[in-house]
């Protein structure tokens, strides 16, 4: 359903999900907002459970694939969260778009196995700036791409390097870094 809210999608006919994109249905307690928030943070938490199993990067290509999948899923979820719950792209008076890295972003959920202390994890659970969130997404997707090198996914339900590169491209397009996209 987020595709309908994208920059290049217009829907003129009646449909069951049109109400989700009306301004009256954007309150914090509305079902779509709650579903998006809960689903995406569940993805982050499940990815963190997998990341927590690894004290260091594994050498086995299958285990590297599992860890790479977890980092890619967390990057993907945070990428959607920042787009749904903050508008990081702003226009100046001339209509030129840019990223305001100082705007409030979203809470980041990380693990102690990544080197964070409990105090740091607690402080990241508050709203971080858009810049901090973008830095975390870029770090996660970069790590995922590195870990997925040489990994052959068993089916299309699993992320491989090409899929992670697609997530990275979407991130860099949003971040207006055309050369990296």
Where are these regions (language model features)?
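Acidic, glycine-rich segments characteristic of secretory precursors and extracytoplasmic regions
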Residues: 1-6
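Extended ligand-binding groove/face enriched in aromatic
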Residues: 69, 76-116
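Short, helix-capping/interhelical loops that line the mouth of catalytic, cofactor-
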Residues: 10-31, 107-128
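Conserved, well-structured interaction surfaces
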Residues: 16-88, 128-132, 143-151
């Amino acid at each position: 359903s987020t595709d309908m809210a994208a920059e290049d999608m217009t829907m003129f006919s009646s449909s069951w999900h049109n109400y989700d994109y009306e301004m009256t249905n954007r309150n914090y307690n509305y079902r779509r907002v709650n579903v998006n928030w809960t689903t995406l943070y569940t993805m982050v938490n499940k990815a963190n459970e997998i990341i927590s199993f690894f004290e260091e990067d594994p050498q086995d290509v299958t285990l590297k694939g599992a860890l790479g999948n977890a980092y890619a899923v967390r990057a993907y979820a945070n990428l959607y969260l920042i787009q749904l719950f903050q508008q990081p792209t702003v226009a100046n008076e001339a209509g030129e778009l840019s990223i305001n890295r100082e705007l409030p972003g979203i809470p980041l959920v990380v693990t102690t196995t990544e080197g964070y202390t409990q105090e740091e994890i607690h402080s990241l659970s508050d709203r971080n700036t858009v810049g901090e969130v973008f830095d975390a997404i870029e770090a996660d997707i970069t790590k995922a791409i590195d870990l997925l090198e040489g990994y052959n996914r068993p089916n299309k339900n699993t992320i491989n390097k090409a899929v992670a590169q697609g997530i990275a491209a979407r991130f860099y397009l949003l971040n207006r870094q055309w050369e990296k996209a």
